[in-house]
């Protein structure tokens, strides 16, 4: 009992001795990990115990236990170890940009934080879209991005199955830059990280109900649907329906879905 109390007290002392910048960024790290592992393990449990549920690319997107363990190990290396290594850098960037950070003790103003969220959405849409497209360039793809495309029909844990460079530049950069640039209140930053991690797990889950359709088509067709936001793919004409060779390409599950007349396609 004494040792447990001492450990808890030490943890509180460490947190109390951090400045606001470090508290905010480490909070983002903890929230991101909690949401990622919750979503990944939950989706894997559904895959394992409810294998008959329809997936966007059919049942081939179910991982074996061995493949899941491998993907989870890579995810652990990225989101636990690599992400922790860059937390000080995130805090330092926040420190360099804003002399007066907002902490948990500061008042939360919803109108301001709504603008912060809007700004963060614009940042991640632009940042992820262009870093992702760059990763598809022939000079970079084989060395870095090909690893993420190992799974043409991914599941949630594959959301951060990536080369560390891609993970840190594209994934972490895209999610973290918005709250840092906009000097988000920590509650906003933590909520943004939670939504971002749950969203990326959903988009890799293979379940249409979790938002997998758009990004799953990217993994299947490769040269479309690069973005995660609502703007860049539309603006730069890289949606599946904007590209002639893909526009009328049937979805692999179409034969199991109702057609326009309500009958099976």
What is the predicted role of each segment?
Residues 1-26, 30, 39-64, 68, ...:
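Cytosolic/stromal cytosol-facing helical appendages immediately following the last transmembrane segment
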Residues 31-48, 82-87, 120-131, 199:
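Hydrophobic alpha-helical membrane-embedded segments
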Residues 57, 84-124:
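Juxtamembrane helix-loop-helix connectors linking adjacent transmembrane helices
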Residues 58-79, 104-116:
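Interfacial transmembrane-helix boundary/kink motif in multi-pass membrane proteins
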Residues 70-86, 159-167:
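Select subsegments of transmembrane alpha-helices in polytopic membrane proteins
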Residues 79-98, 170-181:
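Alpha-helical transmembrane segments and their membrane-interface junctions
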Residues 100-107, 123-153:
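Membrane-interface loops
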Residues 109-129, 133, 189-202:
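Membrane-embedded alpha-helical segments that form the functional core of polytopic membrane enzymes
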